[in-house]
Amino acid sequence: MKKKTGYSPYPPAIFLMGPTASGKSALALHIARYLPVEIISVDSAQVYRHMNIGTAKPGPEALAATPHHLIDLIDPHEHYSAARFRTDALRTMREIADRGSIPLLAGGTMLYFKTLLEGLSELPSADSDVRAAIEAKARKSGWPAMHQELFRLDSVSAERIKPTDSQRIQRALEVFYLTGKPMSETLRKPKNVSLPYEVVKIALVPGNRQALHQRIACRFEQMLKHGLIDEVRAIRDKFYLSDENPSMRCVGYRQVWMHLENATDALRMREMALAATRQLAKRQLTWLRSMKETREFDCLQENLPEQVKTYLLNTGLKFTEVS
């Protein structure tokens, strides 16, 4: 075993961030070969049980090789929030550090990384009665009308939310109904939060955007071959879901759902899924550019694993290399 000299009073943690199809999961497993890490999934879709193919969850071999956390937490009809992720992640990071291992947080849900680094404003928890009332009103009036109501109550939030984004409209209205204050006002309050870890932030970015798009297309074809359509059909039938459930708004699942509802043919489903995934990757890269003190690596380089290994083992942090 070889120890490196570190100067931070905090235990180390690694953030491995990147757009979809950038190779985060494979790289995380490679890091586990030489550092004593446990992997924490930072993926808002992998929290759902039964959603395996379309979320590219690690398989049995990967799970057996390295401990993974924050996967398969809830059923597809349930809700999961950034606030709950922060609570779950901080608890899990502490447990991993107490075991003498390194928390390696890998994923593409940039909002979750942001909440860990910056904390969350004190928004109220979800209220099932209020949500039910909002949904009932939306069924009668439509979400564009609910967006107009939000504009009247909280114009700042309404300007940031599309009239078709029912999930965010509902949340903004819910916060106003519960607190009597616009959500935008609460979000402006300062957050004094310090993450008690010495974090190494790694960002995987494509040197060639078209090459990433090709990866996205190949991966989606593999998902279809492995039974994504049957997976969505089984989930829909078992849990009596609608397309308003957050789980079914995940990229890929939403487009397959529309196909199963005969709203699109197979070719159009593919086109829509790929377009949505490319847009997701674009948003993820925008988030990454706003991250400070981040070391970028080209995710398309063949020697990426060795580049990252060299970097991690020379950070000066208190890593214990696996012999």
Curated annotation (Swiss-Prot):
Keywords: ATP-binding, Magnesium, Nucleotide-binding, Transferase, tRNA processing. It comes from the Bacteria. It holds the Pfam family IPPT. Its cofactor is Mg(2+). One of its GO terms (molecular function) is tRNA dimethylallyltransferase activity. Disulfide bonds: none annotated. ATP binds at G18, P19, T20, A21, S22, G23, K24, S25. The record marks T109, R131 as: Interaction with substrate tRNA. Belongs to the IPP transferase family. Catalyzes the transfer of a dimethylallyl group onto the adenine at position 37 in tRNAs that read codons beginning with uridine, leading to the formation of N6-(dimethylallyl)adenosine (i(6)A). This is tRNA dimethylallyltransferase.
